[in-house]
């Protein structure tokens, strides 16, 4: 029937967008991989495997479902839900596969806390993670960066992140935006959703860069300045120190 065919098209379009998001998260893992490489960290294989898993899942699905059509509001709500779950799953892979957090449930918790900017952490519990006797400070730099980066992309909302890439996929982002920001506000922004997303991201990146510069000039090591800017800008709260910002007082 035409209704069943329409639903299949919507599922196809949703899978296309989710696959694109998974692929972008996978590509972004190149940054902590390079950090780990230049710091001669022993766990680079875990990052590479994480990238391979994300891209091997996302690229075939994206290619198969490439023909895009118009999404409904119902699809938008479903996408919001699955976007958080998929990005949190992808984000947990470097924690788990580098054995920084050897329990997958704990890795999932840490990742979900990051992308939702909740700020709760499993790290520091020596009973659960006896391999991290010094808590957060036991983590390698690549993982410290990845924790911070997850909060940073979560800070603007996964949906705004999606809106930014939707024009590349030929799909409108209004349904996703309405699912994240319901009511008259979404309707007002509706005609300029693409431009709004661009401006918000530019402001977000700009403030992050300014904060990094100020922290660095104030004496904080540049790597830690970047990580703290990535976590304070979205009000997430992750830190590279057990005592958080108090460690610098």
Regions found by a protein language model. Give the residues of each.
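Central hydrophobic cores of alpha-helical transmembrane segments in multi-pass inner-membrane proteins
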Residues: 28-30, 49-65, 83-90
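Hydrophobic alpha-helical transmembrane segments of multipass membrane transporters and ion channels
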Residues: 23, 27, 82, 86-90, ...
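Alpha-helical transmembrane segments
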Residues: 46-52, 144-165, 208, 247-249
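Single conserved hydrophobic/aromatic residue that forms the stacking wall/gate
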Residues: 1-7, 11
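Short, hydrophobic transmembrane alpha-helix segments
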Residues: 32-45, 64-69
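Cytoplasmic-side transmembrane-helix entry/capping segments in multi-pass membrane proteins
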Residues: 71-82
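P-loop potassium selectivity filter motif centered on the GYG triad
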Residues: 19, 28, 90-154, 217-249
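Juxtamembrane interface elements at the cytosolic ends of transmembrane helices
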Residues: 57-66, 158-193, 205, 222-229
């Amino acid at each position: 029937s035409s209704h069943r065919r329409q639903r299949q098209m919507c599922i196809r379009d949703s899978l296309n967008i989710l696959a694109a998001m998974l692929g972008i998260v996978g590509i972004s893992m190149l940054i902590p991989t390079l950090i780990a490489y230049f710091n001669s960290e022993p766990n680079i294989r875990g990052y590479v495997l994480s990238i391979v898993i994300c891209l091997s899942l996302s690229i075939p699905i994206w290619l198969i479902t490439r023909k895009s059509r118009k999404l409904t509001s119902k699809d938008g709500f479903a996408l919001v839900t699955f976007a958080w779950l998929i990005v949190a799953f992808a984000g947990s892979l470097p924690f788990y596969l580098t054995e920084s957090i050897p329990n997958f449930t704990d890795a999932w918790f840490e990742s979900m806390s990051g992308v939702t900017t909740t700020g709760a952490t499993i790290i520091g519990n020596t009973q659960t993670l006896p391999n991290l006797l010094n808590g957060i400070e036991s983590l390698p730099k690549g993982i410290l960066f990845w924790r911070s980066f997850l909060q940073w992309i979560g800070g603007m909302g996964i949906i705004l992140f999606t809106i930014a890439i939707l024009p590349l996929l030929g799909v409108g982002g209004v349904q996703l935006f309405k699912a994240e920001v319901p009511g008259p506000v979404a309707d007002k922004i509706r005609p300029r959703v693409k431009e709004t997303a661009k401006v918000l991201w530019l402001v977000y990146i700009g403030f992050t860069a300014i904060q990094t510069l100020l922290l660095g000039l104030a004496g904080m090591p540049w790597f830690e300045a970047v990580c703290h800017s990535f976590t304070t800008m979205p009000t997430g709260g992750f830190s590279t120190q057990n005592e958080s910002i108090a460690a610098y007082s």
